[in-house]
Amino acid sequence: DGPTAIFVANTLNSQYLGAIMVAAYSYMALVPIVQPPVIKLLTTQKERRIRMSYKKGSVSQLTKILFPIVVTIIAGMVAPASVALVGFLMFGNLLRECGVLNALSETAQNVLANLITIVLGLTVAGQMTADKFVRPDTLLILALGLVAFVFDTAGGVLFAKLLNLFLPEGKKLNPMIGAAGISAFPMSGRVVNKMGLEEDNQNFLLMYSISVNVSGQIASVIAGGLILTLMA
């Protein structure tokens, strides 16, 4: 998770901020390359073809508004240090769903998001001097990032398979959606959906995989807050 990794590293005054940022965003971009082999290694073709039941329904406007508020409160109780990140994430969600701040919502989604991305890149790039970046430690951080990414993917798939042991036929999960439980949003969700369509061109997993992907993003922010709380 790029923003969380940068926030935690900066708060802890890490000298490896540049390397951590490169590792985080590199592996987020490499989702289509890293995840499929791990998923295929841990699942059978039959499991990858599992179709999940879908119930049509609408979400009330009140629920959409309460969701970011409740998530922020719960995250603040579990890991107070995570509020700075999860609060901004949920604030953007609230801007979009409240229905009365359309101009601010469009600005935040487009102009502001792009501007912050540029400023973030320039800020961190200023710290990536040769004496801090061109070091053996940088390779170790990149390797650690790859290991973490692989284990995250494998852990999600295996946990979904574990849940299937207790679920009745007709309600079993497609284990591939477990791999989307990381913060690489929305790339991981799309990769899982694409893999599902490759196995069965009528098996649409996008709604499930994106939902898991969002959960992974929120959990990642809370995990970063827990790290700061434990190391404070």
Show which residues each predicted segment covers:
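Alpha-helical membrane segments and immediately flanking helix-loop junctions
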Residues: 1-16, 55-63, 167-218
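Entry/N-cap segments of selected transmembrane alpha helices
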Residues: 27, 130-157, 209-213
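Hydrophobic transmembrane alpha-helices of secondary-active transporters
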Residues: 92-95, 113-135
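Membrane-embedded hairpin module used as a gating/binding unit in multi-pass transport
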Residues: 23-100
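Alpha-helical transmembrane segments
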Residues: 15-33, 142-152, 177-180
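Interfacial helix-loop-helix linkers and transmembrane-helix boundary segments
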Residues: 101-110, 128-143, 160-171, 197-202
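Juxtamembrane and boundary regions of transmembrane helices in multi-pass small-molecule transporters
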Residues: 20-48, 155-169, 212-232
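Transmembrane alpha-helices that form the ion-translocation and gating core
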Residues: 122, 127, 143-191
